[in-house]
Amino acid sequence: MNPNEVIIAVVRTQKAVSMIEKENKLTFIVRLEATKDDVKRAVEKLYGVKVEKVNTLITPRGEKKAYVKLKPEYKATELAIKLGVIV
C-alpha cells in the first residue's frame, strides 16, 4: 500500500497529546485496510523516524486508529510540533 494512502489524519485530542508527552506515542487515523506493517512503513517513510511498535483498534464510529510508539532515539514531541499537533 502506498504510504501516502495509509495515513488519513493525525489525532489532536487531549489524550493523544498526553501520550505524545508521556509515552513517546503518536496517534493516527488510518485506512481500515492498512495493516500494522503498512502503518509502520508509512510513518517511517513519510516522517523519517524509526517505529518501535504499532497498536491498532477500530473505533465504534468505524475509524481505524493506530498508536505508533517511536524508538527512544526519536522524540514524538518534535514530530508532533512539525505536524502541528503541539504548538
Language model feature labels by segment:
Residues 1-87:
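Contiguous, often N-terminal, cationic amphipathic patches that form binding interfaces
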